């Protein structure tokens, strides 16, 4: 029969390789049109041609649970069990991304934990877009690195239960695997080296540029005192020019000043002269007292003249 596994096939994980796919899905694949027409009589060499014709990945879809061509070819490879070198060439093929994914799927189902990490982790650097068909028959956009990440960490992929994998940390401690080096780490190292070179180029420029004047610790620690209003210094001519102009006196004040000046200008002058004369003369205080208490002879003669006139009348 066409659905039997080849005679010289080895058991995988202690069972028939075709039994890695669930029985319900396996029977749906056997009944599908693609399996009967395209997968009949395929060998390891002819599978490559069919893999190059793939346009999307996926498991089963629709209400009738129809399998995708990707799932049919996966079961066919489990049936014929190609050699490991052929699968490695599938994975290393960079021209056809769906051929690469088909080889990665087969390696994940049949390979050991060490082989899965060794051959699938380099595909993390493949960021090409792929189409994936979901259960409703709708297409979704994915990337190759996303598909590989799900293969290594998910429990189910393309409606197939994936075998258990040992943790990478355990394999590293057993020295079966080397620590993984990410492509991002290499890019970061290149960026750091370029930044260090730029810093070294900038250092001589900084040494040549003069340093700005620094204040002494006294200037920094001592708080600045604002000048007291009582002993302020006179403003410089620049500050005077910048200071706001004084307000012009009101017209009422000007009138009061004019009245005060116009009252007795001669009187003010005579008083100022008398004060200067008194300050110069030594007997100023005595003469002032004498004048205030004693009457002058002229005033006496005037009074006697008035009395004589009254007597004659």
Swiss-Prot record:
Organism, as annotated: Danio rerio
Start-end of Basic and acidic residues biased regions: 203-224
Bias (Acidic residues) occurs at 184-202
What's the name of the protein? Pre-mRNA-splicing factor 38A
Query: Biased composition, Basic residues: where in the chain?
Result: 225-250, 260-294, 302-313
Residues covered by region (Disordered): 182-313
Which residues does UniProt call coiled coil? 172-201
Q: Could you tell me what this protein does?
A: Involved in pre-mRNA splicing as a component of the spliceosome.
Where does the record place the region N-terminal protein interaction domain? 1-179
Which family does this protein fall into?
A: Belongs to the PRP38 family.
- Annotated GO biological process: mRNA splicing, via spliceosome
Classify the source by domain of life: Eukaryota
Recorded GO CC terms: nucleus; precatalytic spliceosome; U2-type precatalytic spliceosome
InterPro entries linked? PRP38 (IPR005037), PRP38_C (IPR024767)
* Localization: Nucleus
Q: Which UniProt keywords apply?
A: Coiled coil, mRNA processing, mRNA splicing, Nucleus, Spliceosome
Q: Name one Pfam family in it.
A: PRP38_assoc
Subunit structure, as described in the record: Component of the spliceosome B complex.
């Amino acid at each position: 029969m066409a659905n039997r596994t080849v005679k010289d096939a080895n058991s995988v994980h202690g069972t028939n390789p075709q039994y890695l796919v669930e029985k319900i899905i396996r029977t749906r694949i056997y009944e599908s049109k693609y399996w009967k027409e395209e997968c009949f009589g395929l060998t390891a060499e002819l599978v490559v041609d069919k893999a190059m014709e793939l346009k999307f990945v996926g498991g089963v879809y629709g209400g009738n649970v129809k399998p995708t061509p990707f799932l049919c070819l996966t079961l066919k490879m489990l049936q014929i069990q190609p050699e490991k070198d052929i699968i490695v060439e599938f994975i290393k093929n960079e021209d056809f991304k769906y051929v690469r994914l088909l080889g990665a799927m087969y390696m994940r189902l049949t390979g050991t934990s060490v082989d899965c990490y060794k051959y699938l982790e380099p595909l993390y650097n493949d960021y090409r877009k792929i189409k994936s068909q979901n259960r409703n028959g709708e297409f979704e956009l994915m990337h190759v690195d996303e598909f590989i990440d799900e293969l290594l960490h998910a429990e189910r992929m393309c409606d197939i239960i994936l075998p258990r994998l040992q943790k990478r940390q355990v394999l590293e401690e057993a020295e079966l695997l080397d620590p993984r080096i990410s492509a991002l780490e290499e890019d970061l190292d290149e960026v750091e080296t370029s930044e260090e070179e730029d810093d070294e180029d900038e250092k001589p420029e900084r040494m040549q540029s003069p340093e700005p004047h620094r204040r002494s610790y006294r200037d920094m620690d001592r708080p600045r005192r604002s000048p007291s209003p009582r002993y302020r210094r006179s403003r410089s001519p620049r500050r005077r020019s910048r200071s706001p102009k004084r307000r012009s006196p009101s017209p009422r004040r000007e009138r009061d000043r004019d009245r005060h000046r116009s009252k007795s200008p001669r009187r003010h002058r005579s008083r100022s002269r008398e004060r200067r004369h008194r300050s110069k003369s030594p007997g100023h205080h005595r003469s002032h007292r004498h004048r205030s208490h004693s009457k002058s002879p002229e005033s006496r003669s005037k009074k006697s003249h008035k009395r004589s006139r009254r007597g004659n009348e």
